[in-house]
């Protein structure tokens, strides 16, 4: 940081992917928007990892979720984290369950697959939604 002071930081998670066979690009899950003010010292370093858009699918199947965005003090102390939005499959309207939230647990999503917390997402395939059969 060039000066000691209070810095306002805003992070936005990436949008989820979509299916090109529909209007999914309009209705894909949106990333969370998080912001806060942090006291940082002159010479201190922060690192920023920007989440990438979720994978786009061309065969009318589920697409990948968006990546989270992370701002870290030094090499390992998180300041702010914004989760990415969920990917959608053949959507013709918005499903708010696919949008990221400010909470620490994952959301259920549109097809009722379990939202995860602490690395515990869906455990079994359901109607091809996990890329398994």
Say what each PLM segment does.
Residues 1-8, 41-45:
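Extended extracellular/luminal ectodomain segments enriched in beta-structured repeat modules
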Residues 15:
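C-terminal reverse transcriptase regions that engage the nucleic-acid substrate
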Residues 18-32:
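Short, surface-exposed beta-strand/strand-loop-strand elements in extracellular ectodomains
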Residues 28-133:
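Secretome/extracellular-domain signature
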């Amino acid at each position: 940081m060039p000066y000691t002071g209070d810095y306002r930081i805003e992070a936005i998670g990436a949008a989820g992917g979509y299916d090109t066979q529909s209007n999914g690009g309009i209705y894909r899950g949106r990333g969370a928007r998080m912001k806060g003010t942090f006291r940082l010292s002159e010479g201190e370093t922060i690192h920023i990892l920007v989440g990438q858009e979720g994978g786009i699918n061309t065969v009318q199947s589920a697409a990948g979720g968006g990546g989270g965005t992370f701002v870290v003090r030094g090499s390992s102390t998180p300041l702010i984290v914004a989760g990415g939005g969920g990917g959608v499959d053949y959507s013709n309207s918005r499903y708010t369950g696919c949008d990221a939230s400010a909470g620490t647990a994952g959301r259920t999503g549109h097809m009722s697959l379990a939202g995860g917390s602490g690395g515990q997402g869906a455990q079994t395939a359901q109607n091809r939604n996990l890329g398994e059969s």
